[in-house]
Amino acid sequence: MTEEPHAIEITLDRLLLERHMTLAELAERVGVAYPNLSILKNNRARAVRFSTLTRLCEALECQPGDLLRLRER
């Protein structure tokens, strides 16, 4: 049985661009490994911890809704 992909997208690339910040800078600020943030940025993550989401929002000065969006199916 194959699992259907989720419909949540991470808009990290847009937020980084708007804030003139690199993924490496964000990784350092939030204390998450660069490869893990890359997986998240490229929408390959299957889950995100609330603690990680909180740190991302704090570093990017945004709300969770700014980072997540529902993809149209």
Task: Specify the residue positions occupied by each region the protein language model found.
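Short alpha-helical DNA-recognition segment
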Residues: 21-39
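DNA major-groove recognition helix of helix-turn-helix
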Residues: 41, 52, 71
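Short, basic-rich loop-to-helix N-cap that marks the start of a DNA-contacting helix
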Residues: 44-55
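Short C-terminal boundary/hinge segments that cap the last helix of small helical domains
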Residues: 61-73
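A short, Lys/Arg-rich alpha-helix, primarily the initiator
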Residues: 1-21
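Alpha-helical residues within the helix-turn-helix
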Residues: 17, 28, 58
